[in-house]
Amino acid sequence: MLQLYDTYTRSVREFQPLHPPEVGLYTCGPTVYDYAHIGNLRTYIFEDILRRVLEFNGYKVKHVMNITDVGHLTSDADTGEDKMEKGSRRTGKSAWEIAEFYTQTFQEDMCHLNILDPTLWCRATDHIAEQIEFIQSIEAKGYTYRTSDGIYFDTSKLPDYGYLARLDIEGLQAGQRIDMGEKRSVTDFALWKFSSPDERRQMEWDSPWGRGFPGWHIECSAMSAKYLGPFFDIHCGGEDHISVHHPNEIAQTQACYGTRLANFWMHGYFLQLDSAKMAKSAGGFLRVQTLVDRGYDPLAYRFFCLSAHYRAKLNFNWESLDGAATALNRLRLAAYEWGAPGTLDEGYMDKFAGQINDDLNMPRAVALTWDLVKSELPSATQKATLLEFDRILGLRLADWKPTEQVVPDEIMALVQQRQQARKEKRWKDADALRDQITAAGYEVKDTPQGAQVRRRVKAEG
């Protein structure tokens, strides 16, 4: 039985698909004005684990992820400039060019981290007509008003607006310190923004209300409803979406269809760098390429993320990543040396299913993985069971092989001397020679075919 935490009800609930065995899953994708940082990617790793667990349980998942390539202003309060236009000025490229470039780099990052591609990518700019139609439906039901800079959603028309975030609307109104302009309430938000008459935007479209561009929130409501229906199984995102973006998605869909959009709302928590949230706006952030440049396999970062529950903040430091890289190499080497897989151990599989079905409890699942590695089971059974675990872990254990290396002549000479000492039963000499080999960074293993020597736990990327 799969149990998942639902942010909307603030409870762990049994997951039952609305239309079994199909599951509709929508995950908020990147705003492609810059590179994704590893904090962003922690959320996508959590969502990848969720999808793998759903499929592990026999469900057929239709996974939709959006690409925000227009409409996301530098402030979630509908102020500031479009991040795509800002990125265009920063790079000297067109907004369309940077959207394509950063979409590709994001997809490459996902590949490096072995995050499964969604069933469907959907770009906001490919769905302008759907967004306009959605806004028209909201307008027809009396939930909008017009200002000099756009069409806004009137949140006062929804008595339970902000329930997902448990917002204190009256308190927000009393304590607001920002210039709301013509907004009637601090929580009202833009559905369509008008282009400034004295500015030519790269991304703008004609609409029934005038030339402009869609607000940030409308794309997710319109595209998820198009591909998954107005009420589907699971909607995911980062914890930063709980306060603004997701309540606004829910409001739009309530106004249009009378639903809260998704049966489960799930959120991954932040990665912290020195106990502070990692964010592009802070001026410095770490990319997957940063890890590669420092000699790390990106899958070591994936393994690092599995050390904490997705609903717990995770503090990043290089020492912790070193530990994850070492542990991953140990796991890879064990799987490689076990040889061909045999039959699964049902006892371990039952325990593993219990951990992952307990709201994706990956720390316990990883602990069980090490228990399997240390067990006295036949190596073929260990191998088969570990590879089945890896359907969820996503570490590509079946594909890994030690890097082929040329062993220096002086090391081979020590190996040969040790072999001779063993043949003559000079065990102390043999042990001393092994210590010399180890100190030089190599390890020797005695097999029926003779001694095998290699550099100690060197993984290929």
Regions found by a protein language model. Give the residues of each.
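Short secondary-structure capping/junction motifs at helix and strand boundaries
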Residues: 60, 97, 107, 111-123, ...
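Structural preference for alpha-helix termini/caps and helix-kink/transition segments
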Residues: 277-280, 284-461
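N-terminal, positively charged nucleic-acid-binding surface of large information/translation enzymes
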Residues: 9-12, 18-114, 449, 453
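The substrate-binding groove and active-site-proximal loops of carbohydrate-active enzymes
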Residues: 88-94, 119-125, 210, 238-239
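Alpha-helical recognition segments enriched in aromatics with Gly/Pro capping
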Residues: 1-33, 48, 101, 107-108, ...
